[in-house]
Swiss-Prot record:
Residues the record lists as binding Ca(2+): N8, D66, D122, D176
PROSITE patterns recorded: HEMOPEXIN_2 (PS51642)
Pfam families: Hemopexin (PF00045)
Subunit structure: Monomer and homodimer.
GO molecular function, one term: calcium ion binding
Entry GO terms, CC: cytosol
Hemopexin repeat boundaries on the chain: 4-55, 62-112, 118-166, 172-223
Superkingdom per UniProt: Eukaryota
Keyword Zinc carried by entry: no
Location of the protein in the cell: Cytoplasm, Cytosol
Cited function: May play a role in response to oxidative stress and polyamine biosynthesis.
Official protein name in the record: Albumin-2
Length: 231
């Protein structure tokens, strides 16, 4: 994590144009109004343990979420350091539940044992290709298929080579959080007080940053007064 108090995890909701953003041990539910500055906070900031009752007695309820990605229906994987869980986040209700875990990343995803991903993951986003997800740790990334529970191409690559659009930007060395937009093949990346909206092409390297790397609060007005968050 680059700076405490900023967005350190996020995932796209099953509800259109909504996303969960995690900051320290809290989160907000946001209508992020893709491509505009009409975003608004729908809920929060509130402690993870209060908004997700099923996480109350877990590491996530105590310390928060530092990486996450959506899967199918109302389900998402969440991470904190070397632990992870699959949850049903039950949008706009209090019926959330843990489906699997919490367990160590290496137990949930055995192919990460002995890799930089074993003890924590910085950020992730759901791809539009099948059940694939991109995960980031430091200046490296991997592509996994959560349905077959395997690493695509069995290789970990550098962000610099896989995402040439990030060369000579703050994202070349890593990212704090990411989530896939409801707009096809658009992804938001966050690092400290900056963000980038990127058009991605699954499996290719011709991604492009839209409008450059920008200050988050300049274009996400609903987060003013929320980040940086002081616990």
């Amino acid at each position: 994590m680059t700076k405490t108090g900023y967005i350190n995890a996020a995932f796209r909701s099953s509800q259109n144009n909504e996303a969960y953003l995690f900051i320290n041990d809290k989160y907000v539910l946001l209508d992020y109004a893709p491509g505009t500055s009409n975003d608004k906070v729908l809920y929060g900031p509130t402690p993870v343990r209060d908004g997700f009752k099923s996480l109350n007695q877990t590491v996530f309820g105590s310390y928060g979420v530092d990486c996450s990605f959506d899967t199918d229906n109302d389900e998402a994987f969440i991470f904190y350091e070397k632990f992870c869980a699959l949850i049903d986040y039950a949008p706009h209700s209090n019926k959330d539940k843990i489906i699997l875990g919490p367990k160590k990343i290496a137990d949930m995803f055995p192919f990460f044992e002995g890799t930089v991903f074993e003890n924590g993951i910085d950020a992730a986003y759901r791809s539009t290709r099948g059940k694939e997800v991109y995960l980031f740790k430091g200046d490296q990334y991997a592509r996994i298929d959560y349905e077959t529970n395997s690493m695509v191409n069995k290789e970990i690559k550098s962000i610099r080579n896989g995402f040439p659009c990030f060369r000579n930007t703050i994202f070349e060395s890593g990212t704090d959080a990411a989530f896939a937009s409801h707009k096809t093949n658009e992804v938001y990346f966050f690092k400290g007080d900056y963000y980038a909206r990127v058009t991605v092409t699954p499996g290719a390297t011709d991604d492009q940053i839209m409008d450059g790397v920008r200050k988050t609060l300049d274009y996400w007005p609903s987060l003013r007064g929320i980040i940086p968050l002081e616990n």
